[in-house]
Amino acid sequence: MQQLAELYPQHISELQSRTKEALSREGIDGLIIHSGQAKRMFLDDNNYPFKCNPQFKAWLPVIDNPNCWLIVNGSDKPKLIFYRPKDFWHKVPPEPNDFWVEQFDVVLLTQADAVEKHLPYDRSRFAYIGEYIEVAKALGFDLVNPDRVLNYLHYQRAYKTDYELVCMRQANALAVAGHNAAAAAFKAGKSEFDINQAYLAAVRQSDNQVPYNNIVALNENSAILHYMEQDVVAPSESRSFLIDAGASFHGYAADITRTYCNGSIPNSSHFAELINGMHQVTLSLADSLKPGVPYSDIHIAAHAQVAQLLHQFDIVNLSPDDILAEQIVSTFFPHGIGHFLGLQVHDVAGHVADDRGTPNPPPAEHPFLRTTRMIEARQVFTIEPGLYFIDSLLADLKSTEKSKFINWDVVDTFRPFGGIRIEDNIIVHRDKNENMTRDLGLN
């Protein structure tokens, strides 16, 4: 894409600037960033699927090649040691020739264990950034993943460059195509397994290429927050469908959730109305993302709006304010309202107050909130309110004095549908918000 090529030099310039500041804080000369290496399964000769170091893929869209290295110091042209072995067992990556190549001095590495000759001779003033501590020690690095460096780099990752925003829009476009295909498969009565296959075919990515394991849940399975099973047999009656699934583009993630209802099923009209109500909650909360507002305030607002739904649909026989006062909402909405999104699905530095890593934990009453940062321009968030009928949490509630406030007959009519989550991906700009998910056609 020409747009990526035009924006990429500024992206590298920003990473150089961040690197220079991180190095000055640690008092060192440079970073050696390791893409990672193949990891063998225990007592086996097969490897786990390769997952690239996010600090490596922040620099360039090489996300599937182990044994690569970057040498960066914030001033000189970054050096890329690109692994290209002689190998007749596996596909060998081609020599780099994409839009990003001119930003690097590229050296080809044919043997993974021969990297030492390409690294700085005196590594005492360089820090290794990566997962493989034993490799770092064998190569003579004393400084490994220093906190001051990572705290600063992680904090700054919340602010996306124009190049990164284009990548994230493209990831959303891919995911939207997948969600549309999955919705069609649900309407055709397909199994969870077949719905997932339809999704993957539409995004043109495998299970190992999408940014996380897709959640594809029919009926009561929609009440399991991280349901991963994917039954191969379609149920005799497909009442509801929740899909939480994303896509990757150049290492950046989309993370989208939708819930659907089969309108031909008895008692489905109220659940369909509840889904529509949750769409309005998502849109309202997305509009509330403003620079200068703590993200935790969005979560508190989500609880208030879910309380309104619990009252409106006669699930709880209390006013919304009293539902909040009795702390009933968390039974039906037990997770956080969202998180940072970027190179990682749950992107880093959500629980810090500054670029030195000062902790800023979530409130005790909302322990699962993944982000407590102040909202600022160029940050990207998910907004994902939900309302679920989870047997274990409902049983806990029923054993308390608060049970008398619950209309259990209504709860029981909703249980077969499982639950609802509606999740959009939002870019916060200085004077507006950009709902990538909706703008790209998924309503």
From Swiss-Prot:
Taxonomic source organism: Pseudoalteromonas atlantica (strain T6c / ATCC BAA-1087)
EC number in record: 3.4.13.9
Entry note: cofactor: Binds 2 manganese ions per subunit.
InterPro entries per record: Creatin/AminoP/Spt16_N, Creatinase/aminopeptidase-like, PepQ_N, Pept_M24, Peptidase_M24B_aminopep-P_CS, X-Pro_dipept-like, X_Pro_dipept
HAMAP family the record matches: X_Pro_dipeptid
Name under which the protein is recorded: Xaa-Pro dipeptidase
Database matches in Gene3D superfamilies: Creatinase/methionine aminopeptidase superfamily, Creatinase/prolidase N-terminal domain
Cofactor annotation: Mn(2+)
GO biological process, one term: proteolysis
